């Protein structure tokens, strides 16, 4: 939403998602379907998106059948399933976006987010943080492979901050063991 929706209050989710209807975005994949329908204001944002020329698949199976055009795929009521439950969904959804966006002769810009990395840092949940990190790493690997074959694509990976103050305090390479501790439930000054 950062690149096409604007609001002074990051928690004003219902207002933020309404901005998608008038955005120039060509491909969206993610969670939050409950914010698009059965709204307090009576709007059906999926219908409004379709009226603006978007296809709005509500499942992965519907999405894979789409071969061109603008796509707004929000198949999950809230967040996507947990990393261990969703498999390589982030990589597949990202590559599907590239398949559609690369049809534009003028090129494309795409932002892919490991959206739960921040949450799991706030929760100090090392298990879910590692799952999400591995998922994001595999996704970036798939994108780099595509970009290498394409030969004309710049891939930039960045972060805005670290969350949780995760510190490695011990470990053993031979045993494949690490011991880590969180120092905060908030953001830290750790370099990313």
Give the predicted meaning of each segment:
Residues 4-192:
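A post-motif C-terminal structural segment
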């Amino acid at each position: 939403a950062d690149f096409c929706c604007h609001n002074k209050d990051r928690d004003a989710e219902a207002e933020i998602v309404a901005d998608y209807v008038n955005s120039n975005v060509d491909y969206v994949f993610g969670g939050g379907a409950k914010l698009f329908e059965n709204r307090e204001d009576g709007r059906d944002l999926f219908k409004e998106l379709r009226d603006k020329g978007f296809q709005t698949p509500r499942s992965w199976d519907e999405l894979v059948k789409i071969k061109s055009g603008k796509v707004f795929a929000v198949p999950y009521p809230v967040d996507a399933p947990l990393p261990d439950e969703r498999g390589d969904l982030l990589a597949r959804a990202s590559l599907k976006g590239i398949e559609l966006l690369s049809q534009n002769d003028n090129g494309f810009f795409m932002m892919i987010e490991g959206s739960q990395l921040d949450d799991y840092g706030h929760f100090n949940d090392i298990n879910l943080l590692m799952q999400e990190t591995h998922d994001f790493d595999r996704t970036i690997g798939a994108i780099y492979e595509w970009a290498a074959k394409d030969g004309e694509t710049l891939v930039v990976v960045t972060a805005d901050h670290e969350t949780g103050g995760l510190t490695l305090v011990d470990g053993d390479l031979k045993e494949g063991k690490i011991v880590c501790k969180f120092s905060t439930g908030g953001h830290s000054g750790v370099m990313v």
